């Protein structure tokens, strides 16, 4: 994975007030951004997240370097997941 690769994240309330969806790791004291290598995997996994059902969510692509910058400024880790929600990699930006 290079900083110029596209990855996929879930966006909450796309538009002017959008933000990248974060989650709390089960059994751990760490918050993270779920990220995916494939858009379809992110769409399939969306139903597995703790979300506010009154808000709208969509999957969007982001440059990996930009995601790392966002995660670092927000104090979040990045967890790469597969479509079943299995953690493939944990990144501390």
Locate each region found by the language model:
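Conserved NAD+-utilizing ADP-ribose enzyme module
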Residues: 1-93
């Amino acid at each position: 994975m290079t900083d110029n690769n596209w990855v996929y994240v879930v966006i909450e309330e796309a538009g002017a007030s959008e933000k990248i969806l974060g989650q709390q790791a089960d059994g751990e004291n760490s918050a993270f951004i779920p990220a995916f290598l494939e858009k379809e995997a992110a769409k399939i996994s969306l139903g597995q997240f703790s979300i506010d059902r009154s808000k709208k969510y969509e999957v969007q692509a982001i440059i990996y370097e930009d995601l790392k910058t966002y995660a670092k400024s927000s104090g979040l880790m990045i967890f790469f997941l597969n479509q079943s929600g299995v953690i493939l990699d944990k990144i501390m930006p």
